[in-house]
Amino acid sequence: SKSITEVGHHLYAKGAILANLNWWLIAGELRPEWKGGHGGGEETAAVMGMDPALIHAEYLEEGEGIRNDVSDELPSASWMDVNFKGGSITIPRPIRSITDNGWLTHGMSIDPPTKATQAWGVEMLNTMAEYMRDFTVAFDKVALPKIK
């Protein structure tokens, strides 16, 4: 996000480096079948991998109830975007204005929460923990910037 980037710039000027590891993006880059959306299979599997009791399975079959909250001419394309003549336009608004249950897997139909399993979550979380560990070892060797 812009705020994290600004903090990173500030820290760099002070002689430090910020590394922002977005696990949900990296997981899909490491294994394309894990790529997902907000409230989709990827996030649901991650929660199942930690504690399956946290998932309300009775809601997994519910439809998303996506609304074109801005207008029919500007249909919802994602959480923050609407579609206009094939292009995505960002219009920041609360997720509840788009969907009642918080799921936004439309546009990412390969990632419905119904596909999530505990085994997927455990494998993904273990893979990401190993990746983050390996990154930390490599990042620890990076020379800090010189303060100007």
Provide a role label for each language-model segment.
Residues 1-148:
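Extended, histidine- and acidic-residue-enriched regions that form the cofactor-binding/catalytic faces
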